Amino acid sequence: LAGASSAVAQASDAERFWGQWRGPDATGVARFGNPPTEWSETRNIRWKVEIPGRGSASPIVWGDKLFLLTAVPVGEPQPVATADAGQQAPAGRGRGGRRGRRAIPMHRFIVMAIDRETGEIAWERVAREEVPHEGHQQPNGTYASGSAVTDGDHLFAFFGPWGLYAYDMEAMGQ
């Protein structure tokens, strides 16, 4: 046990935290983790929080925060313009192709930080607000699919065609 504690104390932050998709070694394994082997709605659950919108990115962990990305629809769906002449796409059954593209609501592309101990939202920042130009999503797809990444000083969030955003961790209160 003393050897394990010593190894954790000597590990760098990059080794101790989950700063990228699939963790420090990109293997999905937390070498210094001690996760529960059993859980349910009431057992080994510290907190549970509802996240607005949809995001399929893997959360990352650094220090006392968990970071995640989400895309939140806001307002009413907007007609989608066609690529040629900027005209409104013809009405259709929704999935694109010759019948037209479905209308899509404005989305807020959000970076969130959640306190690891309490589950409270520490902060959230709207990276961008825009109507997505991709009208088609797979059933499990989202507009926030790429995982954030951090080097401990900066947090990087990639929202595909909506941009790459860099945040100063110190300025964000990390």
Residue ranges and their predicted role:
Residues L1-S6:
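Bacterial N-terminal signal peptides
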Residues A7-Q174:
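Noncatalytic, solvent-exposed loop/strand surfaces
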